[in-house]
Amino acid sequence: MKNFDTGRVQDKLINRLERQEKQQAFQRDRFFKFKLPEIHRTLSQTLLMEKIVETDNSAAFSDVLLKGLKKILKTSEFDFKYFIAPIRNLVPRPNPISLYITQYILEVVINEPDVIDVYGTDKEIYQAINKIISNINIKFERAEEKILEQLSHNSSLVPGSRDYEIALDQLFHKTMGEPTGGNPQ
């Protein structure tokens, strides 16, 4: 009797990978919604102070950068991956947000009339951006862990339940403030 491969193992693996990818995208979006003002402010200052971007109008550069950061929130997963494809092998295990911002600077910001030039290699620009994103992300993850720890002390809440999700959302908003979703002012 022949043993036919039904593909169940592959289907399970594919489903697990897709679920994992969706979870990462959800966490990335939540991080970005709550930390957009801080990312925008720190990134603008650092890129100008480290002379990675030279401009004669820093406000215009800041606005262009903000437009790119907001674009991350609105872009589809396919468009996101397509946009970072030219530099996805820049470093091993890259941060997707840092890659996106790097590519945005290399493709869009460099062509702005108020930007004189962008200095540094692709890798140097990525490393400067990734340092900022990583530092902000570490703070965000610590705050997130504290929130989850607070919820774990409440025995009436079961992870995954609707009450748990509501309590998590309320505690998140109380601790982090309201998500800006693109309005850093």
Residue spans of the language-model regions?
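Charge-biased, low-complexity intrinsically disordered regions
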Residues: 1-24, 30, 37
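Short acidic, glycine/proline-enriched loop segments that cap or flank alpha-helices
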Residues: 31, 53, 93-97, 113-121, ...
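Helix-boundary capping/turn motifs
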Residues: 15, 76-77, 142-143
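Alpha-helical oligomerization segments
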Residues: 127, 131-185
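Long amphipathic alpha-helical segments with strong coiled-coil/leucine-zipper propensity
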Residues: 26-112
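Extended, amphipathic alpha-helical coiled-coil scaffold segments used for oligomerization/tethering
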Residues: 81, 121-124
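Amphipathic alpha-helical interaction surfaces
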Residues: 49, 71, 75, 107-111, ...
